[in-house]
Amino acid sequence: MAKYIFVTGGVVSGLGKGITASSIGVLLKASGLNVFMQKFDPYLNVDPGTMSPYQHGEVFVTTDGAETDLDLGHYERFIDENLTKESNITSGRIYKNVIEKERRGEYDGGTVQVVPHVTNEIKKKVYHAASTSKADIIITEIGGTVGDIESLPFIEAIRQVRMEQGRENVIYMHVSLVPYIAASKESKTKPTQHSVRELLSLGIQPDIVVARTEQALDDNVLEKIALFCNIEKSNVLVATDVASILWSHKMYEQNAQIVISKLLNLKSLKTDMSEWKRFVEKINQSQQVIEIKLVGKYIELPDAYLSVSESLRIAGYENKVKIKIDWIKAEDVNKKNDQQLLKNAKGILVPGGFDERGFEGRGFEGKILACQFARENNIPFFGICFGMQAAVIEFARNVCHIQDANSSELTETKNAIIDIIRGKDKTDALGGTLRLGNYKTTFVPNTLAHKLYGKKWGFRTSRHRYEVNNDYREQLAQAGLVFSGLYVEKNLVEVIEIPKYPFYLAAQYHPEFTSRPNKPNPLFNGFVQAVIKNK
């Protein structure tokens, strides 16, 4: 029988509920338990696939093709498990299911209400995750902040879960802000007290409070939180401002796994954190700083490229260097200033992104110039998704001399080097129209991609609708572009490279989704190694 941990947040958003949940997942997995993680998001979008990166940050794609919240990237990196579409449930999806059932007459003409129909649908998703994953522990993060009107059905649903499953099978963990007031040199517990009081008014008594704070908290503060939150002092955990990847180690040092095992009546846990300790050692050994220029469209919100930046840092630690990212807005790069913006670059990365007709000036030409600068100056280059398409178009224009080479996604052109995938008809719809999830990529022998992966093929995660136009492949290949990774079944290009350069490679899929702290993605690892050699 599965046991459940629900993680809520209070006072303000952005406190690190996802990192907290992930860290707990690490501890429990290191204790020999099977863990499954999911997140409930209160917004009414069916999924985040059509949301602006400025609103939502990165869209993380699971192997089964679900477009999900960026927190799932944290979950997968921390617990080293591939999650599924059942790991991210939105209010939009819940209400859509309820309305569809009502239209089919499944409620026998009854009045459809938030309680019990919406809450039952939410609980169904929790229990379905338990039955399909066969996990020992289901960790569920509730998005938003306690008290938000949008999250009330989820709070009510998880209250009912404890009633149905029993106190020894359910834990409520609450992450709350404990601000430090510099003027008085005090840590204030009042916001947390009020947040827990709000939670109590909704029928939930938290079992563990995670105090999110800038400064370490002394015993007096911990005792005060415990007193006013009705919990033992040992059940107050502290999360200070450290690198997110270190949170699990900090939780381990506070015996979070012991607290959880007592609350859930688990057998005595033997937690082996040796793998994470090795990773922490790598971080501590990484002193040299290497700068990589990332030329992207949404750099004002770095969370839009969260998995990319995390993958770079992980690869850096693997090679005992710290990666510093120089964020360059693609829209700012033009022929007058590209030399200035990109000079002294040791490595250039152009990540994914989307654009639309009439807005091709919003960054795409800047990405093309970045690709050209890297190629002409023999700078290690790595392109991802839209970044690969930019690299192919740049090569077509400046090496093959196809001056009007472009993407049909952006503009009408006689030479659509990038065109819509056959079978993906053009449509005004946005949601659910992409090539999503894992597809088998075959690597061409004696290429850089084949060397880096060390295998003939593998499944890679895609999120796109446009591809290299096969009508131009022969011309591009004759000019020196190598198509080193292919989806053979439909003859689609997945990886390109230029062999005469130390590292000039781009992938149509998203390698950043598969990096793990002790297992950097091979393409990121190879790119960072090339940058180190170029320093």
From Swiss-Prot:
Assigned keywords, A-Z: ATP-binding, Glutamine amidotransferase, Ligase, Magnesium, Metal-binding, Nucleotide-binding, Pyrimidine biosynthesis
Region (Amidoligase domain): 1-266
Family per similarity comment: Belongs to the CTP synthase family.
Regulation: Allosterically activated by GTP, when glutamine is the substrate; GTP has no effect on the reaction when ammonia is the substrate. The allosteric effector GTP functions by stabilizing the protein conformation that binds the tetrahedral intermediate(s) formed during glutamine hydrolysis. Inhibited by the product CTP, via allosteric rather than competitive inhibition.
Known role: Catalyzes the ATP-dependent amination of UTP to CTP with either L-glutamine or ammonia as the source of nitrogen. Regulates intracellular CTP levels through interactions with the four ribonucleotide triphosphates.
Ligase recorded as keyword: yes
Binding site residues for ATP: 14-19, 71
Molecular function via GO: ATP binding; CTP synthase activity; glutaminase activity; identical protein binding; metal ion binding
Designated name of the protein: CTP synthase
InterPro entries: Class_I_gatase-like (IPR029062), CTP_synthase (IPR004468), CTP_synthase_N (IPR017456), GATASE (IPR017926), GATase1_CTP_Synthase (IPR033828), P-loop_NTPase (IPR027417)
Glutamine amidotransferase type-1 domain span: 291-535
UniProt binding sites for L-glutamine: 54, 353, 386-389, 409, 465
Reaction(s) catalysed (UniProt annotation): UTP + L-glutamine + ATP + H2O = CTP + L-glutamate + ADP + phosphate + 2 H(+); L-glutamine + H2O = L-glutamate + NH4(+); UTP + NH4(+) + ATP = CTP + ADP + phosphate + 2 H(+)
Further remark: CTPSs have evolved a hybrid strategy for distinguishing between UTP and CTP. The overlapping regions of the product feedback inhibitory and substrate sites recognize a common feature in both compounds, the triphosphate moiety. To differentiate isosteric substrate and product pyrimidine rings, an additional pocket far from the expected kinase/ligase catalytic site, specifically recognizes the cytosine and ribose portions of the product inhibitor.
Pathway annotation from the record: Pyrimidine metabolism; CTP biosynthesis via de novo pathway; CTP from UDP: step 2/2
Annotated PROSITE patterns: GATASE_TYPE_1
Biological process (GO), any one: 'de novo' CTP biosynthetic process
Subunit structure: Homotetramer.
Active site (record annotation): 385, 510, 512
Chain coiled-coil ranges: none
Pfam families documented for this protein: CTP_synth_N, GATase
Lineage: Bacteria, Bacillati, Mycoplasmatota, Mollicutes, Entomoplasmatales
